[in-house]
Structure formats: structure tokens, C-alpha cells
Amino acid sequence: MYPIVLYALHVAVLIFWVRLWSAPAREFYFNPFLSGTIRLTDSIFAFLRPVLFMPERAAALFLLLFVLVFKTVVAWRFGDEWLIRIGQGFVFAPPPAKHHAVSLFLFSALQTAVFILRLWTVYLLVRLITPPARTSRAGEALAFFVRPFSYLPFLLQPFVLLALHGALAVVLVHVCVLKRSVMPDAQGSLNPFLTGPLFAQALKMGWLAVLSFTDGLMFLTRGLFVLIIASFGAALLHARGAVIICSEGVELLLGRFARRGGTGMGLDFTPLIFFFVVDLLYSSIGRILIQLIHTPLLN
């Protein structure tokens, strides 16, 4: 399956997931980042209401599960690789199971959960680098799409996020199968998380959780890259509305490093500099964590 199709299905699941935590009848969205999504989901519910005979949240849950099943079937039909990548060193696959279809569905759901978890991580990273008093339509939209995580108090969010990444690490290590890992010693164990004493295994899973957390940096740079390319494309097509939306998105991801009020003063290379710095930071942290996981003392 092409990555763009996979991401589109992830986004479809995300839209119905967020709808479980929102009440459009009691909320008003005067925001170009949100109004289109809300109108689309409202149209879907209006079309299916005579068929489903369900309350809106129950219908959203039903459609969420339907998209997950559809994603699983499409990925299986087109021979997609059933993998979850953590950092640049670890690739996990679904475990062999008697009921293969159920196993693939659960792993497909886990893939989407990882997508949502990384989006939550991006939200926290953006909040950390953004001045508290700064608000924007893009920031409001991002907070909407990470519900219910954005409902939590800011001081509690890092701990909840680390706990979720820790739970993900435990599931990947003890339920899924590690297919490949970047190992300094080719003679070592295929799965370094199951070697050594218990305290060493727990420590290495903790580092895997931190490595999963740093994947938020990768997600941040990917989002920034897409917005930069989309902004250039919109400018070439003279689509002023799309240019404004992309510019606000770039400004959101740059946080306090964005140039405000600097338009019209020549080319701004801040997004590209930010992209390369964050990508370098992500690669450096990833290499350090991989070396710690493969430390001979703990294996």
C-alpha cells in the first residue's frame, strides 16, 4: 500500500475518533482548519442516519471500526508490510496467531494508535516551544484533533504521554515480533529487550519508550516538510487561501522560532533551518538510545 493511502486511512480513523470527544451541536467552529472536516463528518452522519439508527457517538465508533476493518483488508489485499517502526533501529511485526485475520486487525489498530500517539507527541512538543500567550487558528485546530489529550492539564500531559509510550513499548516487546534492529554486534541477540536481568530489560524498554517519544520529532519534521512543499505549490497555483493556511501551519510548528510580521522582506529560510536542526537532533538522540539499548553490560 502506498504511504499516502495509509496516512489517509489513519486520518479517517482520527476524524471519527475525535468526533467521539466533541459535540458539534454545542460548539461553533469559525476556523478554516476545522469547518471543512466538521461539515464532511456531518454530511456522512446525515447520510447514514436513516440506516444506522444510532446516536452520533455510537455511529462515530461504528464508522471508526469500519475504517479499521477496511484498512486491514486493503493492506492485506495489496500485500502491505505489517510493520511498526520505532526510531531508526527497530521494526516490529504482528505475532503468529491461530486466528490470523484477528491478529492482523489488532495490529492494524495498533498502527493507527501509534499514529495518533505521535500526533499527541507533536502537540506537546509544539506547546513546549510556543509562547503561552500565542494563539492561532492552526493551534486551535491541532488542539481539536488531539482530543481528549488536549483536555488534560499541561503539567500532566508529559507524564501521560510517557506512560502511553511506555505501554506501547511493553506491547511491542512482549506481544509483537522484533524483525530487525540496528546492532553494533552481529552476534548479539535478535531481541535485546528480552536479554539480561529483569532490571536491565525494564531499563531497555524504558529507553525504547523514550525512543518512541522522540519519533514525535520525526513526525514534526514530516509535517513541516509537507506544509513547506504545499505552500510552494499553492503559491505557484496562485491559491492565496491555501498559501495562508500552509503559512499558519508552518508558523505553528516553528513555535517561538517563527518570524512574525516578517513577510515581504525576502525569502525566509527559518523553516528549512528548523527542519534540518530538528532532524539532526532526532538522529543524534536515536543513535544514543540505540547504543544504550545494545550496551553489552545490559545484554
Explain the meaning of each model-derived region:
Residues 1-299:
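Selective transmembrane helix interface/packing segments
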